[in-house]
């Protein structure tokens, strides 16, 4: 027959929708037409496919060739459909058997020599193909990435000739080579940080409840060092989380590595990063730093040095856990459930309240004014990281507990949250907070007075209750007590700083 149907996969956010490649050969003047909303890069595949077939000693049909990429309303980009188009032409012209095509999917860009080149976003295609119950053929260079999904049927090839021989039953294509398991680098330990017991305690609370955390302090007090220790006290990714995180990295051009498969991502963009770099975008939308940090930690150092509009673009993803990028032709949705950790100096000169301040209160307020109130409201804990007292470095320094000891408490608290809430405390909505974070009348009155004194919002009320619930979980308590509220209120360093500046 002069009609062939081949399956492939597009790339749309973290999804890989099926694309049906229909190839029809008809009589008439020789031509090669492509329909189905192909972009320029896809239209260019006509020349690549023709050269690849001729250089592979195949016959290029002297007929009117029509290639339809369905569905027509799905934009197609890149060279990922080259292999499927070439296979369709060969099957329609009866140069290869077509009986096995419907059980397979094909992904890969063709070189003029017939070599199959790697493409981006293979991991989402592997997951989608597994769910569809088909075997996916990918370029050999994409094999190690595809091998991460162990229950998927995947084959790899380096040349078009090998694929055609496999479809004809003359050759067995290899399975993807599994990645060599890398030896994970030693995770930095919290015992490396001298002193700063309150900041370490805040880090433990943040890890247990997945709360957003802001460190405030002069230069050189260990803010960045503390933040880099957070992944070491977090639990590993579940299989589902690991697959979703790796799929995002695959789309972003970051090849997931076997040794880091269940390791939570830790992203540290520079303060000169644009809004597109942070939240994602582009003419062909790609994930930004907040999506690459999905299920992990996003650390923003020197927070006031970021553009205000860049930081404000994080407000919605912090609440919803995803980011929608709208373009004229489509909308793309990327997951962005990350834990935000920020670090900043309390003033332009870096110091405040330690006798080294060179900035006036008005200068400090202007400096802090670079951060909008709604953005600061997204931090559950804001902690002061002061200069170490004299003698801390020369004497016997207080190192505190190891990351492993703290991690065990974090895992226990998370188990308690998941068994009670089915989710972590930072994800509790207002109705769940009323049920799970109930206070006695005396404690409720105490908290309300504290909120009014600090001039905090209703959002801050909810965040304090969530943090108090996490503190109670770490202590193994069933109910929130006044001591937990007092500790949670102690992690409002930014509110106290602003209050002191405005009053004096």
Question: Over which residues does each language-model region extend?
Answer:
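Short beta-strand elements
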Residues: 19-25, 278, 380-383
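Walker A/P-loop
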Residues: 214-255, 320
